[in-house]
Amino acid sequence: MDLRDFYLLAALIACLRLDSAIAQELIYTIREELPENVPIGNIPKDLNISHINAATGTSASLVYRLVSKAGDAPLVKVSSSTGEIFTTSNRIDREKLCAGASYAEENECFFELEVVILPNDFFRLIKIKIIVKDTNDNAPMFPSPVINISIPENTLINSRFPIPSATDPDTGFNGVQHYELLNGQSVFGLDIVETPEGEKWPQLIVQQNLDREQKDTYVMKIKVEDGGTPQKSSTAILQVTVSDVNDNRPVFKEGQVEVHIPENAPVGTSVIQLHATDADIGSNAEIRYIFGAQVAPATKRLFALNNTTGLITVQRSLDREETAIHKVTVLASDGSSTPARATVTINVTDVNDNPPNIDLRYIISPINGTVYLSEKDPVNTKIALITVSDKDTDVNGKVICFIEREVPFHLKAVYDNQYLLETSSLLDYEGTKEFSFKIVASDSGKPSLNQTALVRVKLEDENDNPPIFNQPVIELSVSENNRRGLYLTTISATDEDSGKNADIVYQLGPNASFFDLDRKTGVLTASRVFDREEQERFIFTVTARDNGTPPLQSQAAVIVTVLDENDNSPKFTHNHFQFFVSENLPKYSTVGVITVTDADAGENKAVTLSILNDNDNFVLDPYSGVIKSNVSFDREQQSSYTFDVKATDGGQPPRSSTAKVTINVMDVNDNSPVVISPPSNTSFKLVPLSAIPGSVVAEVFAVDVDTGMNAELKYTIVSGNNKGLFRIDPVTGNITLEEKPAPTDVGLHRLVVNISDLGYPKSLHTLVLVFLYVNDTAGNASYIYDLIRRTMETPLDRNIGDSSQPYQNEDYLTIMIAIIAGAMVVIVVIFVTVLVRCRHASRFKAAQRSKQGAEWMSPNQENKQNKKKKRKKRKSPKSSLLNFVTIEESKPDDAVHEPINGTISLPAELEEQSIGRFDWGPAPPTTFKPNSPDLAKHYKSASPQPAFHLKPDTPVSVKKHHVIQELPLDNTFVGGCDTLSKRSSTSSDHFSASECSSQGGFKTKGPLHTRQCNSHSKSDNIPVTPQKCPSSTGFHIQENEESHYESQRRVTFHLPDGSQESCSDSGLGDHEPVGSGTLISHPLPLVQPQDEFYDQASPDKRTEADGNSDPNSDGPLGPRGLAEATEMCTQECLVLGHSDNCWMPPGLGPYQHPKSPLSTFAPQKEWVKKDKLVNGHTLTRAWKEDSNRNQFNDRKQYGSNEGHFNNGSHMTDIPLANLKSYKQAGGATESPKEHQL
């Protein structure tokens, strides 16, 4: 109903006339170009047939049949059961339907059709007139894309020149409505003149004076528009040529001329002679005749115009029936200004040249051109509808219709020129079995023309034979999605009887609810829309029964196969497919199968699958739907993949559908737990003895990147808790104290914690070491870390919770043995040396002493050079060791901890942190005169105890400290050497200082200026870690250039590598409190020498830059008693006395030590790594920032002025020339004795 309301402009206009209650007329109005199946009208509703049925008491079902010629393509169709009128697939084009006709009004374009209503008891003949309204389906067009106009240059302003008008096949408001001059110039304008016939002619107006010499051509665009919706338009190029002057224009004698010419006029017949005059002379008076642009192309084809004479002639045969009136516009132009215009109307008169036409349309369907009637059929049985027509007009078009000979049939007039063929009397089969007669149609022209149509009628006998179907099994095929009332086939049966006995009635059997069968004709139609997906085949029976008495019948099987159409899109079994695969699935493994169905058949159900979204991670088999992976899955990187799958069938056009696919990657337990806390396997937690049971003493925390149970972690202590002192929460990882610590529990406890996930079928685990130090305080951090390092060599299954004390006792025993052995060796060496010295002759000693005394008092450069030459010739001892402290210790068998036996190389930051930590105690004053020569002092310390004192409350280190300090002759004095790696000095400087790492603990009180190492971090709160300085293996304290002190002596101590702690902790006592306001220095009193005197070094052992070498002597200069000479003695011993070289056994040179790093800790960039333990277990070392280490190593505790050297802060200087006791700034006691290290 909506479509009808939309397209149908007017429903039922009128019921024009009823003739004998059987002829009625309906008028409908529709738009052209309607699509198929648009309802036009409803015959029973519009005629109110249901009321008529009720009045007459008729209850039989009515059949509506469109009466049409065989082979015609109907523009409309009529439902046989409902009487509804619909459009067909044949497009109704108003311009084509009414081509060549001139209509004053839009509604004059129409077509007619007839519909009969059966059965005969309620016969109706319905004449339907359908008026076709115009739609704007054509754009107006100019006759040519380029329009040329010539205008004289002397044309006056506002002169008008006609422009060929555009044509539009549409009519009314859909036709040409408006002209517009585009990109026109101000020289011209445009005006529209409307003719009495309603045509619109454009005219070009000259708005400015023209000058051909300045510009002879103007090119513009002209646009034409119609008034339809949507509006259509077109454009053309308008080219104006300015021509030379021509004063007078041609003039027609008659502007409007009307002529008549018969339609049978031969070719060449003159229609009219036009004549125009021109007042000019010569060439300006030459007139040329042309057709105007408004002349239709069909008219130009029928008539010819002589361009010179103006004669119009017939050039093709005329047909009044096609076009009765031709309007011709003729222009007369002399090539100058506006041409003259004349309109010629040519009326084509009719002649009787067309015979009548008979349109015979059967009401009773003929069989092979023959109408079968029963001999008992009543009178006035309607056989056919006959329509006669003649294309001629007036008398020539008046037609009469009659039957040629006497037969029991007659024609009954229904409308003008329309008749019904009926039986005029009862039929007698026994009298005549068959009738064949002609229907004649004749016009009234002179001479008269006629037309005939042959009608065959056969009568049927009594019923003695049953009807027989032509085919016992009728097989049909029909496409699904058909329309209701679709004609399928005509089921026919024959009966050898005649008359009533041969009148066959068809009836459907059971299981035929989808079909309608015409009882009379056997026309089988579809009463419903078929759906092949619901039912593909219908099998039912059709019964043909005659009207005999008794009636006879027969049956035929009808098999209707429904053909498939692609009306079903592929359907996925799920709108969203979800597949679950395990991670680490190999590449090209099957992930899942996409299932899709299509209810169609054949190619329409051939489904092809494809992946959308350009997903390259998966491969989809387009036919089987198997999804295979193109990658290996890793759930930790991506847990799911989502893409769309498209299914396309093979129909035309193809149909498709999509579904969503999600690939969920199931977790596989392929990741071990990762320890977050503790940050490393070498950190520790302090457990005070006052801790109460149940308190948390440490926290173990780990994460697992897997999910589900694979990420659920369980914490257990697998080793190190044999006493049951600690308990770990299996869920949180918190380590709590089970019972209050006893004194026997004091020490380092190593707990091996196993962190395992709950993965199935295989659980993964990680081991981590948790060190708990049970004590009231953790004052000596280096001691604790040394214990931790020792435990790294211990198998994980061994308990070391109380192993610190045995290590300590063992170290004390080792130290004592080493001290006793060292003392015995020194005593033996001294004894042997004394014996060797005593062998020298007294005479040789006296002479040498006299000579050396002279040089002592007044040394000269020449003697020094000579002695240097002698010293070069003589093999001097190469075994003298540089002044250094050697610390030997054993490290774990680790890639990071290598055995260390070498000299400590301190970076700049360690120097800054270490120097100034300790006071050296009172410095003895020098006893040498100013500018006196400096005797080399030889040191040999083989004391069984270290050369420095430990505070009583300092715990003894578990390391084995073996300290040996040697000062050979050539390395006694420290000069301003730039390269510290030389480990020797070439000149004297003002001050002697020494420093060590955690093992030495030496510190000066004044600020020192040290070299900087760029690789060190300057952060105060970061533990000092070893970094490589590019050019130094030791440390060196620079000289204060502005020092006002007198010449002094500097002694530099080179310590072997081995400290693993920064200088924040001496390693020999308690650590300094963090944030202490004042620096706590540990005085390091030097051990008094065994005797008051010392031996002087020979002058030839000194370097050129040597100065005073005895800042500590307090007695007058003079030789001491000479001991017995040894084989190592020289002549200098007679004067100066014996030196250490006389009795010193050969040793390692100062450079013959292995180079080792300062610390066994890995650099910061290597702090996260795996360490292998003794038993093969792997520990995760994640050195971040250990709170314990930071507690002991915070650089802030050293004061803000550390590491800077300026004029305002001086080092402690000891004048060499002052013979009095020197008192340090710290107020230490005086000491005139020599301090021996």
From Swiss-Prot:
Residues carrying covalently attached carbohydrate according to the record: 48, 148, 306-307, 347, 368, 450, 511, 630, 681, 734, 754, 775, 780
Its main subcellular localisation, reduced to a broad class, is: membrane
Q: Which domain of life is it from?
A: Eukaryota
Record keywords, A-Z? Calcium, Cell adhesion, Cell membrane, Glycoprotein, Membrane, Repeat, Signal, Transmembrane, Transmembrane helix
Extracellular topological intervals: 24-814
Any keyword Cell membrane? yes
Stretches of Polar residues bias are at: 984-1001, 1011-1035, 1198-1210
- List, for all copies, the residue spans of the domain called Cadherin: 26-142, 143-252, 253-358, 365-469, 470-572, 573-675, 679-784
State any GO BP term from the record: cell adhesion
Ranges of Basic and acidic residues composition bias in the record: 1186-1197
Question: SMART domains under this entry?
Answer: CA
- GO molecular-function terms, A-Z: calcium ion binding
Protein name as annotated:
Protocadherin-9
